[in-house]
């Protein structure tokens, strides 16, 4: 049986974050070895070339003796309850401690951390806050679950005055303590139940973002985001009228304005990102930025010009009076509900929803009510198309097709002037695409080639 040498760190997982962990340990001159549950992980030969002399063990973790490891550091894609790890997780002190990349980051970081989690909108708020900080003149590093891994940011931005980090539940569940200057929990809806078991387990992982936090930003309309045991100042945001101290939307001079309490900040109409869900994102970023001491004028300038991120409610084209919107990042039911709510109030005609893929065990029934109100039809495809059809067909017309290309062809056939075709799948993409970006690009290319490109 292969064995981890004494005083060596064991890195498990050769994904993007796992390789960042390895680079970090190499820079520090700390001895380590690597394991991956896959027999032939992608990028293995390139990793060996970059780290000569580092042992790599592939295959079941039960076949590896980890008892003498200094520490076990997991890539976020590795479930802590994987056989071979679970005993160390369930019985702390029985062997090496099991942590994730963020534990290593926190040990090294000497600048303030702004951390963002939630089932949806993490990337938008992370990017938005990073732009606000830069506009305010701060040296800012942005990454984590978005873009550059957190550990690489330490090397790439050694003079950063602020780290703005998107953090997933997978990252947080292996983070014993974070100590963020401001931490936001944006929303919670069903996702990753195949990893966390149930909503209680999923929420518990997200709640770790508040460990050691000096300030919390939470959703006034979603009590699941509120800290279980607040140990810091808490600021709430809402897209309704705010209470004293909250961020929200008020009527001011005949217009709707973003506001803190009753103090109007800027007209909603000047926020470039459209939709109620994006107004919530703007308010969350403002609340975090205000706590950090960012310039209010700078934050408003960013909101006036920031268009949002690709594949997140992204307007692609209007053709024959029909608008086509790419929300491929809508990989869970909550994200799709937010997209429908954001678009529904501005519809001239009806909505045509394209949904499907790997539902990760989610309940699709919450989609039925808003679709019954707004939609002409739902067109479903992919692995969980049948489950989507069963959840929706009692409330609105549903057509099941094989793939995204067939769904788009059907949408073009039934759409009328004034309608909006929305790709917001409520599912992961991996049954038919490498990732949600590839799915969104297929949507874009199909439109660019007038249906000639394959999806």
Curated annotation (Swiss-Prot):
**Coarse class of the protein's main subcellular location:** cytoplasm
> Which keywords has UniProt assigned to this entry?
ATP-binding, Cell cycle, Cell division, Cell shape, Cell wall biogenesis/degradation, Cytoplasm, Ligase, Nucleotide-binding, Peptidoglycan synthesis
- Chain residues that bind ATP: 118-124
Which ranges of the sequence are coiled-coil?
none
Which reaction(s) does the protein catalyse, per the Swiss-Prot or TrEMBL entry? UDP-N-acetyl-alpha-D-muramoyl-L-alanine + D-glutamate + ATP = UDP-N-acetyl-alpha-D-muramoyl-L-alanyl-D-glutamate + ADP + phosphate + H(+)
Gene Ontology biological process terms in this record: cell division; cell wall organization; peptidoglycan biosynthetic process; regulation of cell shape
**UniProt pathway annotation:** Cell wall biogenesis; peptidoglycan biosynthesis
Per UniProt, subcellular location reads as:
Cytoplasm
Query: What's its top-level EC category?
Result: ligase
Q: What is its EC number?
A: 6.3.2.9
Any one GO CC term of this protein is: cytoplasm
Annotated Gene Ontology MF terms? ATP binding; UDP-N-acetylmuramoylalanine-D-glutamate ligase activity
Q: Which HAMAP family match?
A: MurD
The UniProt entry, under NCBIfam families, shows: murD (TIGR01087)
Q: What does this protein do?
A: Cell wall formation. Catalyzes the addition of glutamate to the nucleotide precursor UDP-N-acetylmuramoyl-L-alanine (UMA).
Tell me which family the UniProt entry assigns to this protein.
Belongs to the MurCDEF family.
Query: Can you say what this protein is called?
Result: UDP-N-acetylmuramoylalanine--D-glutamate ligase
State the gene name recorded for this protein.
Answer: murD
């Amino acid at each position: 049986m292969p064995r981890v040498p004494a005083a060596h760190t064991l890195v498990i997982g050769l994904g993007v974050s796992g390789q960042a962990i390895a680079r970090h340990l190499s820079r520090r001159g700390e001895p380590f070895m690597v394991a991956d549950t896959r027999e032939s992980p992608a990028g293995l030969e390139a990793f060996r070339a970059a780290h000569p002399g580092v042992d790599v063990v592939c295959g079941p973790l039960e076949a590896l003796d980890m008892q003498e490891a200094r520490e076990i550091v997991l890539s976020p894609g590795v479930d802590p309850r994987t056989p071979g790890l679970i005993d160390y997780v369930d019985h702390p002190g029985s062997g090496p401690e099991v942590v994730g990349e963020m534990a290593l980051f926190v040990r090294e970081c000497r600048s303030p951390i702004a951390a963002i989690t939630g089932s949806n909108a993490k990337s938008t708020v992370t990017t938005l806050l990073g732009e606000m900080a830069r506009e305010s003149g701060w040296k800012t590093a942005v990454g984590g679950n978005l873009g550059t891994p957190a550990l690489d940011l330490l090397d790439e931005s050694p003079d950063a005055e602020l780290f703005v980090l998107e953090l997933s539940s997978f990252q947080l569940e292996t983070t014993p303590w974070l100590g963020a200057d401001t931490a936001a929990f944006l929303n919670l809806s069903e996702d990753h139940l195949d990893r966390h078991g149930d909503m209680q387990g999923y929420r518990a992982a997200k709640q770790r973002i508040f460990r050691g936090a000096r300030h919390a930003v939470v959703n006034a309309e979603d009590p699941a985001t509120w800290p279980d045991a607040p140990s810091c100042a808490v600021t709430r945001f809402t897209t309704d009228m705010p209470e004293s101290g909250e961020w929200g939307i008020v009527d001011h001079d005949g217009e709707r304005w973003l506001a803190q309490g009753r103090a109007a900040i800027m007209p909603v109409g000047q926020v470039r990102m459209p939709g109620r869900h994006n107004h919530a994102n703007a308010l969350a970023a403002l609340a975090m930025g205000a706590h950090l001491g960012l310039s209010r004028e700078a934050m408003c300038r960013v909101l006036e010009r920031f268009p949002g991120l690709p594949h997140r409610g992204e307007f692609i084209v209007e053709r024959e009076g029909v608008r086509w919107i790419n929300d491929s990042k809508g990989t869970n039911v909550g994200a799709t509900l937010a997209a429908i709510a954001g678009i529904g109030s501005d519809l001239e005609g009806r909505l045509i929803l394209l949904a499907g893929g790997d539902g990760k065990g989610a309940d699709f029934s919450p989609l039925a009510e808003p679709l019954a109100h707004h939609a002409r039809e739902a067109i479903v495809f992919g692995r969980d198309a049948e489950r989507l059809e069963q959840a929706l067909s009692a409330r609105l017309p549903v057509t099941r097709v094989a793939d995204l290309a067939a769904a788009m062809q059907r949408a073009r056939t039934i759409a009328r002037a004034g309608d909006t075709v929305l790709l917001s799948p409520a599912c992961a993409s991996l049954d038919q695409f490498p990732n949600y970006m590839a799915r969104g690009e297929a949507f874009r290319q199909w439109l660019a080639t007038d249906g000639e490109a394959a999806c």
